Amino acid sequence: ITPWNYPLLQVSWKVGPALAAGNTFVLKQAELTPHTAMLLMAALKECGLPDGVGNLITGAGANCGNPLSQHPDVDMVSFTGGLVTGKIIAKNAAETVKRTALELGGKNPNVIFADADFDVAVDNALNGAFFHSGQVCSAGSRIVVEESLHDKFVDALVERANKIKICL
């Protein structure tokens, strides 16, 4: 079960290992980005993937993801997405004691020490927070700065953040 951001990568990271291990799969792409998964499935079919090895379901999580994660014939559920949905999937999967792999969004800190290359640290913290509009599970959502560097770092970060152009 994959999220809407980076739809081809997220799907590939799930489907590739499943196929490499000799497994079949049922893919449930986020309802906001189903076409990416549809195109990948068409490409897999064109490359000779046998019928039934790869299966795609589309729709909202309540209608598709819940039944998929509850189904007794599904041995494992891999999910990338938010914590609330991850908890629902874990609870559903627990009913049939299936294995789960849950990659849930986190609070990823950037830790900046005084001996760091200052400009590189500011640029990387800025990129970590705003890359892909911050819609990345590994986005730097917190910055921990050594106290002696704090004010200078905040000033530089704010100055550079104010220069970001939106909607180019």
Model-found features: residue ranges?
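ALDH superfamily catalytic-core signature
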Residues: 76, 82-168
